[in-house]
Structure formats: structure tokens, C-alpha cells
């Protein structure tokens, strides 16, 4: 592989110096920007970052052997990272979206055959090959929007066979697609209909059968639970998360989306790497999260699509909670693959600054999936994952909302998107 020399970026947004701990409070606005910046890459790794004149002098005798990318007038950032998706599923639910727009309640949609169980049915019935192809198309779209790493949850199988199938597809995507896929087991996404009269039996199935097998096969790094009234209680979630820890799976938690339910407190108690949603988290829960360094992953696209109030990002940031952003890509409440759009929504609906939003979609997102030592910032020794945007500065990526400014994506030192087209 020839060296790669990215030169003369109008803004090179490095986010350097935050690999050991996520950015919090006012530090989220310090993006470590280099004007007229350049990056030298070899064998998929960043070798040097700095002003163009410095790197041009340092590598003067080697420029002839490198592939040179002229980034004049453009903004270069770390590859974007999506730390909360439900990437692998079958089918879509636009019909229930129409029902919701006409005033139908969630229970009315469920009773009409919609909701999560509709996706569970479609995902169970889909072949592994069909799931792979459908999910690969979504992953291509993530890549086209500057995303180089995604977290992917199971949770639409809700059976031993179904959950394993989803995770096997996620692993295959990771092995075959430029985008890195980091897998999370979410067997505790809901209680499936066939277990509605024996929910504790389903919980035991998760703890005693699913988790050990997922761990044995190396199909996931994280174990997630949807902790919400009517889904899984804090006590049930604690049992499931502790069972995962016993098998080497790091806890994550869907927390306090609908009402204050102790999810944020539980995340701190069990040492979760992240707590996600947090629309209704208590002040005490946020205080404990900040003390334990639990990342708060916010999902403004979900609130936007459901036409509800978004999480109070300013409250989290002011409490010292490290904040990350994610699409929550899923067919029911956030059918989007555009992390830049989510960043715009974070500014418009949650009053985050553009700098905070970019930090939340890069280095803090890397912390939320345990990858801050290798991705999330542009520093020597890190993996060469970068996005080049046709934007004069990083703010324009979000300011011109709904526009995909991604011109080029580099993954592991290889150009995988060029002029808005995937070139795998």
C-alpha cells in the first residue's frame, strides 16, 4: 500500500488528546483544529498530523512515492462513529408511521400487528443471506455519510436462533465491509409474544442460554437491556447485565426514555460503558453517571421522528456527563443512516454547539464503544479513518442540514468513498 498524503485542508479537525478520557463540559468545544492542515498515512495508520508546510518539509523526499489528496477548501475530520444502531433487521414500517401521523397510539399500532413484534416476525422469517444483503445496503449508506464505524445491536430475533442469526450477520458485515461493525447483544429488547405469560422464563433463557453462547462464539462485546416500565424492570435489567459481565460482556443500557425509571442510576451501578436515550433521566442518575464516566448516548433523530421532546443535552453536559450522538437506526422510531443529520438535530433540538456535536460523533462516540485508543481522533498511531467534507469549516457540515457534504471517506488508509460514490 502506497503512503497517503492528505494536504492543505482548510480545516483539519483532529480532536487530539482525548483518547484516555472523553470530552466533557466546555472541553467538548475544543476540537484541536489545524488550519491548512495535512496528514501522512502509511499502512493504514496515521504517521503525522500538522500544518502542511511542516509535513511537506518532513516528508519532502517521500512525497513522490505517496498518493496525494488535495483537500484545499475542505474540512477533514476523523471518520464519524455511530455508537447506537439496530443495523441488522428485515422489513420496514412506513405503514405504521402513517398510522401514527393520523393519531394512532403505540398500543393501537401494536394491536394492528405493528411495532417491534412486526420487525421481529420479519427478521425471524428472513434468511441469513437476505438479512446480510439488506443490512449491507444500509451500511453502504452509512459509509456515504462519512461513518467508518458503527455499533450494531441484535434484539429483533428475541429467540436463541433469531438473536444468533442477527449477530452472525453483523459479524459477517464486519468481516466483509469497510465499515467496522461492533456488536451488542440485545436479547432483552422486549419480551416476545410467546413468552408473555412467562417473562421470567425468557429472562432465564437470556441469562442461562443466550449470553453464554454469544460469549462462547465471540459474537458480541456488549450486553444491552431496554430498561423501561412495561419492558424490563431495573431489577431484571441488573440480573441480565450482571450475567453478561460474568461472561465478559460489557454492559450498555437503554435508559429512562419514557419516564424516570432508574436506568441512569443502574448504568452507574453496574459500570455500564454507556446509557442511551436518557430523555427522562433524574438529576441523581446523571450525577452518578458523571462520577462513573458513563457515556450518555443521545438520539435526537428518534425524538424527531416520533415528534416528541428531545433529551436535554445541556443538562447532561452541565452535569459533567460525557455525551455521544447516534442515529438509533431502526425501522420503527429512527429509520435514518445520516449521522450528519443527527448532528444537525442535536444543534437545533438539543442546543448543542456544532463543536459539541462533532465531538459527540467522533471521539466521545469512540469512548462509548471502547475504541477511543484506535479511532475517533486524528493522531499519530491511530487507525487512518477520515472523512473529507466539501465544507469550508466543520460548522457547515451541520449548518446546511439535510445535505450530505461527504466527498471522500478513507478507511484504514484506503479510499472507500470518492466524489460521493462507494468505491470498494
From Swiss-Prot:
Where is the major localization of this protein? cytoplasm
Tell me what reaction this enzyme catalyses.
4-imidazolone-5-propanoate + H2O = N-formimidoyl-L-glutamate
Q: List the disulfide bonds.
A: none
Q: Which InterPro entries match?
A: Amidohydro-rel, HutI, Metal-dep_hydrolase_composite, Metal_Hydrolase
The residues listed in the UniProt record as binding 4-imidazolone-5-propanoate, with positions renumbered to this chain, are: 93, 156, 189, 257, 333
Q: Name one GO biological process term.
A: L-histidine catabolic process to glutamate and formamide
- Name the residues that bind N-formimidoyl-L-glutamate: 156, 330, 332
Locations listed in the record: Cytoplasm
According to UniProt, this protein's pathway is: Amino-acid degradation; L-histidine degradation into L-glutamate; N-formimidoyl-L-glutamate from L-histidine: step 3/3
One GO CC term on file: cytoplasm
Recorded hits in CDD domains, A to Z, give: Imidazolone-5PH (cd01296)
Report the EC code(s) recorded for this entry: 3.5.2.7
**Which residues does Zn(2+) bind?**
84, 86, 254, 328
Top-level taxon in the UniProt lineage: Bacteria
Provide the binding site for Fe(3+).
84, 86, 254, 328
HAMAP family named in the record: HutI (MF_00372)
Write out the function statement from the record: Catalyzes the hydrolytic cleavage of the carbon-nitrogen bond in imidazolone-5-propanoate to yield N-formimidoyl-L-glutamate. It is the third step in the universal histidine degradation pathway.
Recorded protein name is: Imidazolonepropionase
List the source organism: Geobacillus thermodenitrificans (strain NG80-2)
Gene field: hutI
Amino acid at each position: 500500500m502506497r503512503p497517503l498524503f492528505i494536504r492543505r485542508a482548510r480545516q483539519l479537525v483532529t480532536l487530539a488528546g482525548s483518547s484516555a478520557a472523553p470530552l466533557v463540559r466546555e472541553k467538548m468545544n475544543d476540537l484541536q483544529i489545524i488550519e491548512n492542515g495535512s496528514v501522512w498515512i502509511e499502512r493504514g495508520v496515521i504517521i503525522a498530523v500538522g500544518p502542511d508546510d511542516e509535513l511537506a518539509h518532513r516528508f519532502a523526499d517521500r512525497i513522490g512515492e505517496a498518493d496525494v489528496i488535495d483537500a484545499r477548501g475542505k474540512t477533514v475530520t476523523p471518520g464519524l462513529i455511530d455508537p447506537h444502531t439496530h443495523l441488522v433487521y428485515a422489513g420496514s414500517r412506513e405503514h405504521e408511521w402513517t398510522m401514527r401521523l393520523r393519531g394512532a397510539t403505540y398500543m393501537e399500532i401494536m394491536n394492528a400487528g405493528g411495532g417491534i413484534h412486526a420487525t421481529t416476525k420479519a427478521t425471524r422469517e428472513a434468511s441469513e443471506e437476505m438479512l446480510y444483503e439488506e443490512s449491507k445496503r444500509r451500511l453502504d449508506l452509512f459509509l456515504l455519510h462519512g461513518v467508518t464505524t458503527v455499533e450494531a445491536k441484535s434484539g429483533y430475533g428475541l429467540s436463541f436462533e433469531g438473536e444468533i442469526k442477527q449477530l452472525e450477520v453483523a459479524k459477517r458485515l464486519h468481516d466483509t465491509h469497510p465499515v467496522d461493525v461492533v456488536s451488542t447483544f440485545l436479547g432483552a429488547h422486549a419480551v416476545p409474544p410467546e413468552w408473555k405469560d412467562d417473562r421470567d422464563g425468557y429472562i432465564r433463557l437470556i441469562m442461562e442460554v443466550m449470553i453464554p453462547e454469544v460469549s462462547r462464539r465471540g459474537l458480541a462485546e456488549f450486553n444491552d437491556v431496554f430498561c423501561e416500565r412495561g419492558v424490563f424492570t431495573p431489577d431484571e435489567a441488573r440480573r441480565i447485565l450482571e450475567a453478561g459481565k460474568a461472561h465478559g460482556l460489557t454492559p450498555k443500557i437503554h435508559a429512562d426514555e419514557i419516564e424516570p425509571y432508574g436506568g441512569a442510576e443502574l448504568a452507574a451501578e453496574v459500570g455500564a460503558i454507556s446509557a442511551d436515550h436518557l430523555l427522562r433521566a433524574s438529576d441523581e442518575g446523571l450525577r452518578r453517571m458523571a462520577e462513573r464516566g458513563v457515556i450518555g448516548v443521545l438520539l435526537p433523530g428518534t425524538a424527531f421522528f416520533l415528534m416528541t421532546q428531545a433529551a436535554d443535552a445541556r443538562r447532561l453536559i452541565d452535569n459533567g456527563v460525557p455525551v455521544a450522538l447516534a442515529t438509533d437506526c431502526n425501522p420503527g422510531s429512527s429509520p435514518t443512516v445520516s449521522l450528519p443529520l443527527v448532528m444537525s438535530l442535536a444543534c437545533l433540538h438539543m442546543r448543542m454547539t456544532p463543536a459539541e456535536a462533532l465531538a459527540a460523533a467522533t471521539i466521545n462516540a469512540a469512548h462509548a464503544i471502547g475504541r477511543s485508543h484506535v479511532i475517533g481522533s486524528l493522531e499519530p498511531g491511530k487507525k487512518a479513518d477520515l472523512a473529507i467534507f466539501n465544507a469550508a469549516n466543520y460548522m457547515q457540515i451541520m449548518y446546511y442540514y439535510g445535505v450530505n457534504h461527504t466527498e471522500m471517506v478513507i478507511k484504514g488508509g484506503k479510499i472507500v468513498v470518492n466524489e460521493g460514490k462507494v468505491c470498494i
